[in-house]
Amino acid sequence: CTGKFKGRKDAAVHLENGAKKVIISAPGKDVDNTIVMGVNESSYDPATQDVLSNASCTTNCLAPVVKVINDNYTIISGMMTTVHSFTNDQKNLDSRHKDYRRARGCTQSIIPTTTGAAKAIGLVIPELQGKLSGMALRVPTPNVSLVDLVVNLKETVTAEEINAKFKAASEGELKRYLAYTEKPLVSIDFNGTSVSGTVDALSTMVMDGT
């Protein structure tokens, strides 16, 4: 597993040196497949796929949630915002970076920046290609991030119905990857969690039935 080499050309050097498979722990370029566990792992073909991407942490959080909605309803479009803890790509003090906003001190500001997580959904749920977009807000917390997903659905729904679908999935096919809570928790309560994401049922809202 590598997070250093994010493209097939560089990651494949591991194959030349004896590795049988290479997993990129980030979005990958020109890889054989992008896999999010619980969503599309059945698309993995060990006979033909040697360099794989496990996508980003945000995509792994977002994709199971989107899968539940997409399996039960028709998504017309969607927008996500990830409120993301700072990472080692950022600077502790104002410094140099190709992204001027990420050049600012990560513990001192809320930093708007880009994320490819929403677009990556199309790689693991192909029918949603081009239907989701998003942005990131890097915030001064060291761990645990949040994804705020807003979708426009074809069907008329209620928050209770949506939550029931999430709860059922978290207790069934997505039990290893998606959790569900109705408790008034905050980010620090999720330190050490083993799942890809937790649905905060208290924050589920529906406007005009869609």
Residue ranges and their predicted role:
Residues T74-S77, T82-G209:
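C-terminal substrate-binding/catalytic lobe of Rossmann-fold NAD(P)-dependent oxidoreductases
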Residues C1-A103, M205-G209:
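N-terminal Rossmann-like NAD(P) cofactor-binding subdomain of oxidoreductases
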